[in-house]
Structure formats: C-alpha cells, structure tokens
Amino acid sequence: MECSFSLDHYEHIIRSALEAGYVFMGFHEPTFGDSMQLFLRHDVDVSLDMAVRMAEVEAKLGVRSTYFVLPNSPIYNVLENESIDMILQIAAMGHWIGLHIDLPKTYVMKSLTIEQVTYSMFDFFRQFLPLAPVVSFHRPSEQVFGMKLLSLVNTYEDRFFRDIKYISDSRGQ
C-alpha cells in the first residue's frame, strides 16, 4: 500500500505490525526480554480532533499508544473544556496521555535546569490532565537526548532513541 498519510493507511500499518507479532508498549511500562516491542507515540502539535480519530483506529485494533499533548500549542489550549474532553476521550479508550514539553527560553534566564522546568510543568498539568509519568520534548535540543529523569520517563532516553530502531513521520517524511 502506498503511503498516503490517511487513517486507512495508518490502520494498515498497525495491522501489519500486529501480524508481524509486535507488542505495543507504554514508555513507562517495564520491558521484557527480546520480544518485538513497539513504543507508539503521537506528539499532538496541531489537532486533538485528529488525535481522537487515530485513537479510535488503535482502540478498534486493541492497540494502546501514548498521546503527548503540547501545553503551549498555538492551535489548541489543553486547559480549554473542549480540549480536556478530547484528551479524556483518548484516555478512556485505554491510551496514555503524556506531556509534550516545549522548553521556554526563560528557564536559562532564571538559572533553572531542564529537569526543574520539566517537573514544574508536569506537576502543574497533572492537576488537570490524566498524565502518565512520561514526557516528550518538542523540537528537542541536544541536552535532552539521553537525559534520564528521576520520576518521569523521557522518550529521548537512549533506550528508546539510540538502543532500538527509532522511526518518525515528522514533517510528513
């Protein structure tokens, strides 16, 4: 099937992974053995509505993935009622919600570490959203690659980014 970036094509990809024997895992779940594990994530930069539609496809196939919501998205407000409803709808289908962090430049001016800013943002947003203990950095700097956090999982830890095959469809590629 030719890549069309449609929901039908996406369903085909998920079915193919299932038929190949992949087990879909959450980033925060313990891994096991040398089995074929797939860590599926969606950085929701633009459309929560499309995220709900993708979550429906995955739920229909019995697959769980992690949806990373972007608190400072110029397109949607994660604290708006409609956005919260969509995020809760995704979580109700069995998917995990993570925080997609776009580090503000102000942390450097305030002499804060990336870890301090990350925990501060996570602690604030988990008051309103059903967050799993996992973060993904928006447009990650070299500083976050390989960085381990004490009580949160970073999707750019080596075990997800360097130690296993990493595939991305960012920028439609």
Give residue spans per PLM region.
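Conserved SAM-binding loop
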Residues: 61-63, 90-105
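Active-site beta->alpha N-cap acidic-glycine motif
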Residues: 2-89
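A structural signal for short, well-ordered beta-strand segments and their strand-loop junctions
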Residues: 23-28, 66, 98-100, 126-138
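Generic intrinsically disordered, low-complexity segments enriched for polar/acidic and small residues
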Residues: 7, 19, 64, 97, ...
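A structural motif corresponding to the C-terminal end of an alpha-helix
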Residues: 20, 90-93, 127-129
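Catalytic domains of cell-wall/extracellular-matrix polysaccharide-remodeling enzymes
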Residues: 75, 103-173
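Active-site metal-binding loops of divalent metal-dependent hydrolases
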Residues: 42-45, 101, 139
